[in-house]
Amino acid sequence: MSESEQWGLDQFESPDGGRPDEEAAVVAGDAGQTVSEVVDAADLKFPDSEGVVEMTVSQVDYTIEGSGAEEYPVVHVFGRTAENEPEHVRVLGVEPYFYVPTENVEDRALTEEYDAILDTRTEDPSGERFESIRGEPLTKVIGQTPRDVGQMRDDFDEHYEADILFPNRFLIDKDVSAGLQVPERRLEDGRIQVRYDDEELVAVDAPTEADLRVNTFDIEVDDRSGFPEDGEEPIVCLTSHDSYDDEY
């Protein structure tokens, strides 16, 4: 997944049902609030909840905010409600992690060896120890950012789940397959910002009334010299279709 500054969709609607320039500005990242100076999710601004929002999930991405020792990941969830309103949810406090065999690291202080390792754990919050499918005790290694997980994993002879993309990690751990319920903690710009461990952040069935907007692209490439390889032949045709406008 990209680490581009994608800030998502606010609720804009023009009189003719199209999408105005304001929405494009939000998608491009030219509008909205970012949190840039605090790492701990518990210290960030979470507005009071006004209820819950259920939405069909259309895309999940992430960005890195802050800098240096204060970098932290933010998961961005995009989707639509049953009323077909677009939503952008910022989830803070999602931990990037992987597992290593406990016997390989039990004599090491990993948080002292690596600045990018924030914590190590051998048990989940309920006290159940982490194990491989063969019953081998595992240690959970929590990194500062997803990038750190990718850089550190090869330092260990054995590791598990280090290749799972960070947005997919969020979906797997929250058991999200189609829909998501979130507490309605809205920032001033209309986006929702929640903690990962919020009890109201849970998977739900997708709202069946939601009509996701799909923009389909298709290209045709000069193939007179055989099957074209990436970047070798010119594009001769580019087609785009918008499912809302039903126009090409």
Where are these regions (language model features)?
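The two-metal-ion catalytic cores of nucleic-acid processing enzymes
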Residues: M1-Y248
